Amino acid sequence: MKTTRILTLCLMALVGLTGLTTERAAAQKKEKVILDTDMVEVFDDGVAMMMLAKAPNIDLLGVTIVIGNTWVPEGTAYGIRQLECVNRTDIPIVPGIRQPIYPNRFETIKNERILFGIGDAYVGAAGYPEPASWRAVYLQKYGREPSTEPLDMKAVNFIIDRVKANPGEVTILAIGTCVNLATAVRIAPEIVPLIKRVIYMGGSFFRPGNTTPTAEFNWWLDPEAAKICVRTPFKEQVIVGLDVCEKMAFRKDRYERITNLVRNEGIKGMMKRNYLNVKFLEEPTYTHYVWDVIAASILIDPTLIREEVKRYVDVNSQFGFSYGQALAFDSNQPVGSQPARIILTVDEPRLWSMIEKYCSEF
């Protein structure tokens, strides 16, 4: 009897230790992520960030802001406010590089589009003046004082430091222009083998571009930075481009459903005043896409990927008709180009379910 009790107690202790070990292992398995983004309110960079902040399997180390959809001061303000709304002010927002690599890039855009043609009239931050400061944007937009501030550090240094502190563990999710990451690997090339993987939202390999007939917006705005990145010998590169993103339409009924799911009044207000809501009200048949959210979703759950190809990739940085075009090579690739996984199809019903689930937690 005594022996049986001792054995029982030993087994209970062993089970308890196993449970603790399992919990610790689960915590250790969290994917460490740096989100590098040209932040906007809600769709789609904002939703991508908030999903990562809520995902139980993601450890979002920080959000680095880059030029692109918005100016860096704007992106900084939007990032801070949205993390406040989802109670994740522990995640640092880190302002990054304010201009593309090419000198006077924004000044060339008007003539470039006259000479080479356009797809979409949208040019992001290139279409209006840079705000004075992130705080000015925040106060003007939200009419209140922020509860936190951006990290007093440059985004490039943040990327370098966090990668070195977590060798082989950090995934970079680059959903804006690539100038922060490109600069980081040029300044500190020793971090390249230490990065677990890079996932990009950018490029269009097997279909037309959106900003020009050949180029997707993120890589068109800073082709030089995109080229540096995709030619860097990272352990793994995954590209979520227009090839997959523009198969997944975002329409008025779904936008309204998601708006109704959101609980936080701050986020709900952003959804209601967002340009997309205005566009859907003016043009109910309008179709939009959720580019960056797809990239974040396949990071959270890679089983969402249904079809992909592996190719050597490059970016055309020659100023001309195909400036910023993403290029894929099955063989006979240019010297220096690197292999990448190009995502072509995702499980759309499951992905929408995931988006709606996370939005209901905002």
Model regions: which residues?
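Conformational coupling and interaction surfaces
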Residues: 29-30, 50-59, 220-227, 231, ...
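Short N-terminal amphipathic alpha-helices
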Residues: 61-62, 91-95, 342
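Short, hinge-like loop/turn segments at secondary-structure boundaries
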Residues: 79-82, 110-112, 256-257
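Bacterial Sec-dependent N-terminal signal peptides
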Residues: 1-28
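Active-site histidine-anchored catalytic micro-motif
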Residues: 28-84, 88, 104, 129-247, ...
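Secondary-structure junction/capping motif
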Residues: 100, 150-158, 264-274
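Generic short alpha-helical segment signal, independent of protein family or function
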Residues: 84-87, 98, 360
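Surface-exposed loop and adjacent secondary-structure segments within mature catalytic domains
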Residues: 91-142, 146
